[in-house]
Amino acid sequence: MTRLTLAIDAMGGDFGPCVTVPASLQALESNPHLHLLLVGDPDIITSSLATADSALRARLQIIAAESVIASDARPSQAIRASRGTSMRIALEQVKEGHAQACISAGNTGALMGLAKLLLKPLDGIDRPALMTVLPHQQHGKTVVLDLGANVDSDSAMLVQFAVMGAVVAEEVLAISRPRVALINIGQEDSKGLTSIRDAAAILRAAAEINFIGYLEGNDLLTGKTDVLVCDGFVGNVTLKTMEGVVRMFLSLLKSQGEGKKKAWWLRLLGRILQKRLAKKFGHLNPDQYNGACLLGLRGTVIKSHGAANQRAFTVAIQQAEQAVQRQIPQRIAARLEAVLPKSD
C-alpha cells in the first residue's frame, strides 16, 4: 500500500488537541501506512504528544497555525478572516497536494464554505453535500445525504446527491446496483414538495440509478434502501433526532440493574439483560459512525461532530482513509459524466 497522508485540524471541535491528538495516535497505531499532518498551536500539540511512542511520532508532522475558527462564528465572517487558521491551513494541505484528505471537528458552515472555495466542486455539482453511512436493523448500512450542507435543495441538487450516494454505496459498501430512495412525507407519487417530485421523475428516467421511490423518516434504520436522499434541513434534523434517541436508549440500558433496593437476583438479571441488549444494539452508537464526508468536491473532506470523543474522532479519520483509498471524488466525477445531462 502506498503512503497515505491526511491533514488534521487539531484545534477544531469542543475539545481540540485533548481529543484530536490522542485520536490521531490511535489511528496511526491501527494503520502503519498512515501519516498525519497536525495543524494548530505547536506548543499545545507538542505537549499533548509528550508521552507518545516515538515510532508513531515519526509519522506525525506539526504545521503551525496562528488561530482557530470559533465554533459559534458566522460562516461568512469566519471565511473572510480565515487566513492563518488551523482549518484553512489543513484544507490548503489538500489543495496543494501535501495531503489527500482533511478532517475537522470545527465550525460546520466555515468548513463547507472554505472547502468549496479552496477545493472547488466537481463538474456537474452545484453544491457539495454532507454524507454519512448509518447502520440499520438488518445489520447492513445505508448511505444518507444531505445532512446539513444545504438547507434548501432543488430537484437538480437532489439528483446529484442521489448519484453521489450511489457511488459511495458501490465503492464503500460493495453493493452492486444500490437501491436509491428519496425521503418524503408519504410513498404516494402525489405527495411532497415540487422539488422532490421533480427529482423523482428524473431519477426514474435514469437507467444508471436504481430508484425505488419514496420512503418516510421511520424507514431510516429499516434497511429498505441502500441510499437515502433528502435536503440538508430534513437530513440534519433526522440524523440528530435519531442520535438523541439512540443515546437515550443506550443510557437507559446502562442504568438498568443499578438500583440498590432491588433483590440481588433482580440486579444480576438486569446486568445480564443489559449486556445482551448492549451487544445487540451497540452498533447503533453514534460514536461508531462519526464523520460526515463532504461529497462533490475535488478532494476529500470529513466533518467530525464538534463534541466527538477520542473514539469517535478516530472513526472520522478512518472514514477519510477509506474515502481516499476508494477514490470517491474521482469515481463520482466519472459517474456524473455518465448520468447527468450535458450542458451546452
Curated annotation (Swiss-Prot):
Pfam short name (any one): FA_synthesis
GO process annotations (BP): fatty acid biosynthetic process; phospholipid biosynthetic process
Catalytic activity: a fatty acyl-[ACP] + phosphate = an acyl phosphate + holo-[ACP]
EC number: 2.3.1.274
Major enzyme class: transferase
Keyword ATP-binding: no
Disulfide feature: none
Record pathway: Lipid metabolism; phospholipid metabolism
General function of this protein: Catalyzes the reversible formation of acyl-phosphate (acyl-PO(4)) from acyl-[acyl-carrier-protein] (acyl-ACP). This enzyme utilizes acyl-ACP as fatty acyl donor, but not acyl-CoA.
Descriptive protein name: Phosphate acyltransferase
Native species: Erwinia tasmaniensis (strain DSM 17950 / CFBP 7177 / CIP 109463 / NCPPB 4357 / Et1/99)
Gene from which the chain derives: plsX
